[in-house]
């Protein structure tokens, strides 16, 4: 288990030595991983760090506004790149190809920002489970196996690459980051793209965005899951009034875990599941069916793609 009081000074020293007098940019998503990296890097190199938030169009409801507010003190640069990401994902259905398309677009946008800032280094919040899943061939992560092989940075610096998620949270508390960051539920780097099975379209993203908002609103505070979300699986037959309808199938996922390496589905009360179904199908008219995924990890991963 990590000892934050020892890890923090060593991480700051390592960042200082790797970047020296150079400038660095960081992919700041607002998650605990990137937030911890940003704070460590800021303590190491100060104003030579430029945090950048990319609005990919694949984020949760209200995400960009929330991140802009929380990190306004760090001179956060917000880059709007929704059209580029959707163009890169057009026609792509294979999960690995989707992740790699997102990874390549992600790094190219950052390269462009780095050139403007004359930054030579990219800081990333890769954690140990990301590397294990990528190296083991389970699935690539946008900041590991999904990155292009040729990049315009001297080096990628990964300060927390040997930590598990619960250890990152301990470091976040020790750094005195806001509670909202320390307790923030994991959200995948590729965003809602991996919660939309098959090709990513604006319609499917909007359904996923609204469904995720409902699921988080209903389950986070009451059940404290390690992770919970909604995914759009495809289309199925339903009934709206007395008319046959063909609408989206939404799957709800809620799991408990210590570090993300293994996970068990939460045994949610039946009345809670019924309430979720009612809210999702009534508030999102394009949804025809709601299911609850009870599969543990393994054999499944937590996310659907």
UniProtKB/Swiss-Prot annotation:
Keyword line: ATP-binding, GMP biosynthesis, Ligase, Nucleotide-binding, Purine biosynthesis
Gene Ontology molecular function: ATP binding; GMP synthase activity
Domain GMPS ATP-PPase stretches: 2-184
InterPro entries: GMP_synth_C (IPR001674), GMP_synthase_B (IPR026598), GMPS_ATP_PPase_dom (IPR025777), Rossmann-like_a/b/a_fold (IPR014729)
Reaction(s) this enzyme catalyzes, per UniProt: XMP + L-glutamine + ATP + H2O = GMP + L-glutamate + AMP + diphosphate + 2 H(+)
This protein's pathway: Purine metabolism; GMP biosynthesis; GMP from XMP (L-Gln route): step 1/1
Keyword hit for 4Fe-4S: no
Main enzyme class: ligase
Ligand binding (ATP): 29-35
Enzyme Commission numbers on file: 6.3.5.2
GO cellular component, one term: cytosol
CDD domains reported in the protein's UniProt record: GMP_synthase_C
Biological function: Catalyzes the synthesis of GMP from XMP.
Known partners and oligomeric status: Heterodimer composed of a glutamine amidotransferase subunit (A) and a GMP-binding subunit (B).
PANTHER family: GMP SYNTHASE [GLUTAMINE-HYDROLYZING], GMP SYNTHASE-RELATED
Official protein name in the record: GMP synthase [glutamine-hydrolyzing] subunit B
Organism encoding this protein: Methanosarcina mazei (strain ATCC BAA-159 / DSM 3647 / Goe1 / Go1 / JCM 11833 / OCM 88) (Methanosarcina frisia)
